[in-house]
């Protein structure tokens, strides 16, 4: 009995159970994940650099985009390097402190991104519905406040999760049925009574996920109502095009992340959860820079100018 209690309290290692696939498929998956990781980091660094080097992009919209890029870099870097290491070495072990750290940074960026996307929707609302007051409303002070709220909410939420999980006991199993330390999986693994914890996390996920989503819906409802009143078709197209990139990112991010966290326990499938996790930890962050560059003439123009300026022979 004494040895059992020691194992419960001193256990400081877990095993990440990634995809059960053949060695050949593991190599293919490794190459795919590595390419997506490099594209995500490189793409977001390019966007951040473009915004910094181009005075014409020093506007609230692009400041928000710069914050989003930084969050995406931290987001993927908290999960994918360890996953790549598992695919190469086959060593799926992760220490308890490393697991808590990974979960902290992942939750930090995920929640911050939810909040930031709602701020970006408000920015688009002001730009389209109240254009004459845009500069007055979206001033530097408000932008800093919105950035700070985004990062603070994410930090506070992830810190509470990290503290919560660090107090749990893990006596039954040390096998995490995912390729990273996911909050939902970690809680389910605990040998403690987790009924109230699961309810707390579920309610908090709804609040932190759906509240920004409702704010985004309200913003876009007002935007659509305003755009419909524009008489010229060219004006309507221009207004909608200024929102298309943000709307695409919202659909991708919310569609994949909430579909994983809002699934009832009766319909839960570990393999399906891993697949959805792969989508919102690797695929969606890779698409974000592409969406904001390929669909944005200002960014493409800035990129062209930078290339001409620095690649002159």
What kind of region is each of these model predictions?
Residues 1-313:
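Transmembrane helical core of 7TM receptor-like proteins
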């Amino acid at each position: 009995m004494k040895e059992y209690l020691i194992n419960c309290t001193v256990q400081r290692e877990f095993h990440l159970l990634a995809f059960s696939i053949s060695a050949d498929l593991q190599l293919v998956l490794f190459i795919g994940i590595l390419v997506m990781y490099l594209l995500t980091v490189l793409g977001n660094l390019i966007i951040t650099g473009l915004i910094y080097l181009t005075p014409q992009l020093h506007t609230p919209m692009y400041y928000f985009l710069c914050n989003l890029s930084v969050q995406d870099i931290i987001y993927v870097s908290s999960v994918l390097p360890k996953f790549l290491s598992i695919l190469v070495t086959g060593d799926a072990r992760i220490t308890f402190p490393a697991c808590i750290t990974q979960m902290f940074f992942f939750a930090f960026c995920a929640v911050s991104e939810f909040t930031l996307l709602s701020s970006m929707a408000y920015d688009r609302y002001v730009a389209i519905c109240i254009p004459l007051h845009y500069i007055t409303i979206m001033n530097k002070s408000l932008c800093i406040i919105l950035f700070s709220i985004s990062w603070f909410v994410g930090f506070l939420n992830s810190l509470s999760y990290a503290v919560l999980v660090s107090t749990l006991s893990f006596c039954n199993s040390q096998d995490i049925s995912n390729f990273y330390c996911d909050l939902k999986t970690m809680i389910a693994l605990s040998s403690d009574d987790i009924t109230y914890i699961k309810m707390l996390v579920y309610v908090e996920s709804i609040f932190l996920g759906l509240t920004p989503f409702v704010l985004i819906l309200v913003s876009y409802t007002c935007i659509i109502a305003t755009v419909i009143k524009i008489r010229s078709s060219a004006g309507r197209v221009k207004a909608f095009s200024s929102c298309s990139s943000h709307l695409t990112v919202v659909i991708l991010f919310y569609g994949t992340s909430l579909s994983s966290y809002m699934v009832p326990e009766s319909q839960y499938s570990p393999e399906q959860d891993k697949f959805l996790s792969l989508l919102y930890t690797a695929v969606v962050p890779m698409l974000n820079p592409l969406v904001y560059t390929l669909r944005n003439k200002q960014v493409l123009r800035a990129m062209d100018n930078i290339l001409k300026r620095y690649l002159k022979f």
